[in-house]
Amino acid sequence: MSDFFHSDVLSVSELNAFAKSLLENHLAGLWIAGEVSNLTRAASGHYYFSLKDSRAQVRCAMFKGAAARLAKPLKEGDHIEVSGKISIYEARGEFQITVNEVRLKGLGQLYEAYERLKAQLQAEGAFAAERKKPLPTRPQCIGIVTSLAAAALRDVVTTLKRRAPEIPVIVYPTPVQGAGSELQIAQAIKTASQRAECDVLIVCRGGGSIEDLWAFNEEPVVRAIEACTVPVVSGVGHETDFTLADFVADVRAPTPTGAAELVSPNRQESLHRLAQAQGRLKTVLEQRYFDASQKLDWLARQIRHPRQKLDEQRASIGKLAQTLSYSMKQNLRAHTARFERQTQALQHYRPDVSVCKNNIVRLQTALPAAFSQLLTHRRQSLTAQAALLEAVSPQHILERGFSVVKNTRGQVIRNADVLKQGQKLHITFADGETDVRVSKEQGQQDLFDCI
C-alpha cells in the first residue's frame, strides 16, 4: 500500500485494483439493507439488481448457486438485507456487491434474539446430551404436533402406514406459522405430555422461509419441548434448516419424513431381520442337534443293550453248566471207580457174611423171648422187695398199734426214763398226731396229759 502513495501517478487499473483490495479486506461480513430495483434474472439463473435507499444505490450480482438457496424468488420492491463480497468490477470501475445471502429486512433483530436465546439455553444445559431421552424401539403409539393442513402431516402419516401400519397415531393439531402460532404449538406439546397417550412425539412442519419457520425458534415452543415427558423428535423444514427446537429436541430429523422413519420400526426390515435371526437360530439348532446326535451315537456305542448283556451272561452260564456237569461226571466216575475198588477189597478180606446173617436172624428171634423172661423176673423181684419194704415201713408199724414219740426238738423218745414231768412231747399215730405233756414220772399212773 505504501508503494501506491509513493508513486507519482497511478493508472486507472492500479486505482481500481487498490480500491478493490481495500473494499474486500476491510468490508467483509457486513449486512446491507435496501430496496430491490432494476431487477433482472438471467437465463443462467443469476440475479442482477440494484439495492437502494432514499439517497444512494449500489449494484448487486447474485449468482445461480446463491439464488438457489432463496426461500422465494426476489421481486421488484422487496426490502431485503444482503451479505456478500463488497468489491469493484475493475474493468469498468463499478462498485458492486456479490451477494451470498439474502434475508427480509428486520430479520437481523430476530437473529440477534435467536442468538441470545440459544446462548441462554446452552448455558442452562438444555442442549446437553445427558438430558436427551432415548427413543422407544417399538412404540405403542406415536403422536404428531403439526397443522392438519400441512403437507408434512401427509408425509409423516404415509411413511408410518408404510413402515408400521399396526401402530396407532394421534395428531395434536396446531397452526405452525403466523402470529401467535408459537403459543399454540407449545400448548399442543404440553397437551401431549400431560395426556401421556404416546410413547414418542413428532413436532414437525414442511419447508419454508426463515419467517415461516420462526415459530420453532420462539422460547415457548423450546421450553415446551424441554419440559415434555415424552421423547420428542423434531422434523422442521428441510435438511439445511436448523431451529432451536431441533437443538432442544431429544432427536433432530432432517425432514418430517425422516422423523417418521426414526420413530417407526420398518416392518419389512423387521421381517427381514426376523428372517435372518430365524435362519441363524435354525443353523445353531441344527448344529446343536447334529452335535447331540453324534454324542448320543457315541454313548449308544459305549452302552451295551441289556439283551446283549443277558445273552452274554446266558452263554457264560451255559459254559459254566457244561463245565460243572463235566466235573460232576468226572467226580462220579472217580468215586464209582474208588467204590468198586474198595468193594472188591472188602470182598477179598470180609468174613462169612451168610454166617453172620444167620446169627443175626437167630439173635433177632431169641431177643424178644429173652427180654420178656428178664422183664418177668425183674417184676417178681420188685414185687418181693416192695412187700419187704412195706413190712418194715414206719407207717405199717404204726398201723399195727405202735406210735412215735418225739420231744420238741424232733428227737425220738426211746426210753421213758429220759422224760421229765411237765415236758412237752409230740406223738404220731397211724391216723394222726397230737401234743402231750408229761404229768408224772416213770412208774406213776397217767404218765401223759393231753395238752
From Swiss-Prot:
Keywords: Cytoplasm, Exonuclease, Hydrolase, Nuclease. It catalyses: Exonucleolytic cleavage in either 5'- to 3'- or 3'- to 5'-direction to yield nucleoside 5'-phosphates. It holds the Pfam family tRNA_anti_2. Its EC number is 3.1.11.6. Coiled coil: none annotated. It comes from the Bacteria. GO terms for biological process: DNA catabolic process. HAMAP family: Exonuc_7_L (MF_00378). Bidirectionally degrades single-stranded DNA into large acid-insoluble oligonucleotides, which are then degraded further into small acid-soluble oligonucleotides. Belongs to the XseA family. This is Exodeoxyribonuclease 7 large subunit. It comes from Neisseria meningitidis serogroup A / serotype 4A (strain DSM 15465 / Z2491). The gene is xseA.
